[in-house]
Amino acid sequence: MASVETLLQGVTISGPIEEHQRKILTPQALSFVALLHRSFNQTRKNLLERRQLRQAEIDRGVLPDFLPETKHIRENPTWKGAPPAPGLVDRRVEITGPTDRKMVVNALNSDVYTYMADFEDSSAPTWANMVNGQVNLYDAIRRQIDFKQGPKEYKLRTDRTLPTLIVRPRGWHLEEKHVTIDGEPVSGSLFDFGLYFFHNAKELVQRGFGPYFYLPKMESHLEARLWNDAFNLAQDYVGIPRGTIRGTVLIETILAAFEMDEIIYELREHSSGLNCGRWDYIFSTIKKFRNHSSFVLPDRSCVTMTVPFMDAYVKLLIQTCHKRGVHAMGGMAAQIPIKDDKAANDKAMEGVRADKLREARAGHDGTWVAHPALASIALEVFNKHMPTPNQLFNRREDVKIGQQDLLNMNVPGSITEEGIRKNLNIGLGYMEAWIRGVGCVPINYLMEDAATAEVSRSQLWQWVKHGVTTAEGKRVDKSYALKLLKEQTDELASKAPQGNKFNLAAQYFATQVTGEDYADFLTSLLYNEITSAGNSLPASKL
C-alpha cells in the first residue's frame, strides 16, 4: 500500500480550513479519499458518459425495458441480499434532513428508528456545509455534540438508544470543487463517503452498528457495482470485514426501476434494500422522456402515488426487495405542521396518515418523514399495520409488472395557470435559498428539497417544449412562461428581506423554462454560485 505522503502528492484544498475542521481534513483521511479518487474516478466519468448515450437513445425512441443480458439474474430465485445489519432490522420510521448541528441533535432526539443524515438533496453543498456536516456526525457518533445556541441548549437524549445513523453522500454526477486530485475535482460521492467512512467505520462497529449509507440518483446496476467496488476497497483499507457496510439504494430514476434486481445483486453482501424516492422519480421520468409529447404530465399535484406509473413502480420495488430478503422503504412525507390554522393542519396531517397507510398496506417496511412532528403519525400507522419489525415475509407474489406498466402515463388531470405559478414559486423559492447555502426550504407548509424543485422546472420546460394548452385555454409558450416567471419573481423579491437572491435565481431559472436548454441537474447549474475556492493548499502541508 502506498504511503500517506505518496498518496497526498497532487492533492490540493482550496476551501478555508477552520480549527474545528482539522480533525476531519487530516492527511490520513485525505490520502484515503485520494486513493478512492484514483481507483474509481475514471469509471465514474465513463458511467456519466454512458448516461448521455442512453439519453440520446431515448430521444431517438428507444424506450427502456428490462435488460435481456441480465435475465438470468432476475429469474434466479436462489440468491439473496445481505441479512439486515445491526440497527437496521426495524426501520419503520426514518427521519431525513441536512447535517447542520441543530438538525443532527433534533433528528437523533426524534421518536424514529433511523436518521438519514443528508449531504445530498436537502443540503446546499457549500464547503462549510459539507465539512461541518462531517464534524457534526463525527461528534454525534461519539456523543459529544451537545451545544448552546443563544439561551437554548441542544443535548442528545440519554434515556434510550438513539436512532441508527445512515448517511447519504452526493450522487455520482456531483463534484467537490474545493478538493482537486491530480488536477481534477474529486467526486462529491467519494469525498462524502470517504471522510465519513475513514473517521467513523471502526467507531460505529465498536458501538454495535456499522457504516450505513443511502445511495442516490443511480441510473444503472453498473453504477451500483462502482459503489460496491468502493465499499470493498474501503473495508480492506481499514481492516474490517467485507459486508460490514450497508447501502440502501434510492430508486429515484426511471431507468433504475428496470434494474432493481440487478442493483441489489451488485451490492449483495452490502445491500440493505431499496427506497421509493418519489419526487426524483417523477423528475427523472419527465427528464428522460422530455422530448416525447406522449409523456407530458399534468399539474404536479395530480401526479400522486396512485397514478399508474407510480403505483407500478412501488409494487415492483416491494416485490423485488422481499424476494431478495431486503427492506423496501416508503417515500417522503414532506408536510410540516401548520401552527396557526388547525383546520388546514388537520387536513394536511390526514393526508400524511392516508399516505403512510397506503405504504404499510402495500408491504413497505418503513417510511420517511421530514419533520419530527410527523413521526408519531407514521409510527401509529406502521405500529398498527406492521406488528413485526418488518414485512420481508410479504412476498407480493400477486404482482405482475411489465414494461408498459412502468411507462403508463395515463395520469388524470389538467395543466392550469395555478399549477404553472406553483411550479415557478417552488423553483424560485428553492433556488434562491440554495444560492444562500440552504438546501431544505419550507414553502407553503411543505419541506421542499432539490428533487421537488427539479420536478417544477422540468414540468415547465416540458409544457413549453410541447406547446400545451392550459385548462383556461392559454397556450404555454416561451413568452408566457417568461412573463409569469417575471411576475412571480417580482412578487417574491418584494416580500423577501433585502439582499435576497430571487433575481439571480430567476436568471438561472429563465434558461430552464423555455423548452430549449435543459441542464441535467439544477444543483450542477448553480454550483459555481456557492463555491468559495480561495488559495490552494497542498494537502501535504496540513
UniProtKB/Swiss-Prot annotation:
Q: What is its main location?
A: other
List GO BP terms, alphabetically: glyoxylate cycle; tricarboxylic acid cycle
Which reaction is this enzyme known to catalyze? glyoxylate + acetyl-CoA + H2O = (S)-malate + CoA + H(+)
The UniProt entry, under InterPro entries, shows: Malate_synth_C_sf, Malate_synth_sf, Malate_synthA, Malate_synthase_CS, Malate_synthase_TIM, MS_C, MS_N, MS_N_TIM-barrel_dom
Naming one, the record's GO cellular component terms include: cytoplasm
**GO terms of molecular function:** malate synthase activity
Q: Matching Pfam families, A to Z?
A: MS_C, MS_N, MS_TIM-barrel
Tell me its EC number(s), please. 2.3.3.9
- Pathway where this protein functions: Carbohydrate metabolism; glyoxylate cycle; (S)-malate from isocitrate: step 2/2
Q: Which UniProt keywords apply?
A: Glyoxylate bypass, Glyoxysome, Peroxisome, Transferase, Tricarboxylic acid cycle
Q: Where in the cell does this protein reside?
A: Glyoxysome
Top-rank taxon, per record: Eukaryota
Coiled coil start-end: none
Q: Where is the signal peptide?
A: none
Active site annotated at which positions? 168 (proton acceptor), 449 (proton donor)
Q: What class of enzyme is it?
A: transferase
> Motif Microbody targeting signal: residue span?
540-542
Q: Which PANTHER family match?
A: MALATE SYNTHASE, MALATE SYNTHASE 1-RELATED
Family as reported in the entry's similarity comment: Belongs to the malate synthase family.
- Tell me what this protein is called: Malate synthase, glyoxysomal
